[in-house]
Amino acid sequence: YAFWDALDRHVVRLGRMGIQIDLILFHPYDRWGFDGMGHEKDLQYLDYLLRRLSAYPHIWWSLANEYELTKRTGQEWDAIEAFVAEHDPYGHLLSCHNIFKIWDANRPLTTHASIQSKDMNRLGDWCRRYNKPVMLDECAYEGNLEHFWGCITGEEMSRRFWKAVCSGAYCTHGETFYSDDDILWWARGGVLKGTSPERIAFCRKIIESLPGHLEGEPSFLHSLIPLAKMGEAERNARIAERIDSELLRTVVTVFCNSGPDAESFAYSETAYYAHIGTDCYLHFYDTRPAARDTLQLPEDRKYTIQLIDTWNMTMETVAEGVSGTYVARLPSRENM
């Protein structure tokens, strides 16, 4: 039981640090035999694990890391998910992490989406598709490896967090810098070397100060994607009903008739705008060095406009008592 005793110590230590644990139950890169026991022994292992660890309040269940690479059938995954949910008396969060094929978070026993992807532009779609919390738990790592997945800057990592929260989703951080001792933080922890953690903490502080959960707003072109998938008669009726401008009607019609090319164009122009009802609006301009933005705010509310520099970690009030149409002046810098 030395393995389990060591695991207990780590779980307790992380809990004392205020850290939630997404515990991976099966692993395709396993070197200790857990991935080749067979289904019956898989369930025996899970039975013991759940009896031993379920009482910890800060633990989640990740059925697998990159589940498609393990030696299990779809039916076996169904059984594993059902077994974990049935034998966990405390109802911990439960999901499964993909490499290519995203686990279907619409499954009744799955509590949230656990997604590996570098395509930030689809986060809003996933939030709307699943109507559950979406955790982008592998968006690449801040570091300097030769691999695509381990070689983004701290600035890019910070941007990905803001893109996630402005899509209504969540994001996780990891770090993969080469070091003299040849130990990656991603694998063994230690001292963080990157520039994104303090910026992520700044992001978290702002998001936690808001009056509720942010919901992403699809851009205009993005909102046309469902329209393009309708039948022609229904689509034309919607266009005639909702759009007065002849030019805009032409643009929408051409978009809807342009197939996958138009959809790709729409995703390439994803706008990271979010709101909490009419209480709060958050616009992240990403790499766009905009000089201004025209905001359309409710006429019956009064708003304070604050300019956030996500990289320099500053927040400045630039206007108060604003409603209706307002032209916000921006500093023509990225990361605002």
What are the functions of these language-model segments?
Residues 1-123:
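Active-site mouth of glycoside hydrolases
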Residues 17, 55-56, 90, 109, ...:
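Structured helix-beta-strand junction loops
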Residues 21, 134, 305:
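Hydrophobic anchor at the start of a short beta-strand
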Residues 28, 68, 101-102, 141-142, ...:
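Short, solvent-exposed loop/turn segments at secondary-structure junctions
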Residues 35, 71-75, 145-154, 187-189:
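Short, flexible/disordered intra-domain loops and linkers
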Residues 144, 157-319, 329-336:
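Aromatic- and carboxylate-lined catalytic core of secreted/periplasmic carbohydrate-active enzymes
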Residues 321-325:
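Short, solvent-exposed loop/turn segments in extracellular or other extracytoplasmic domains
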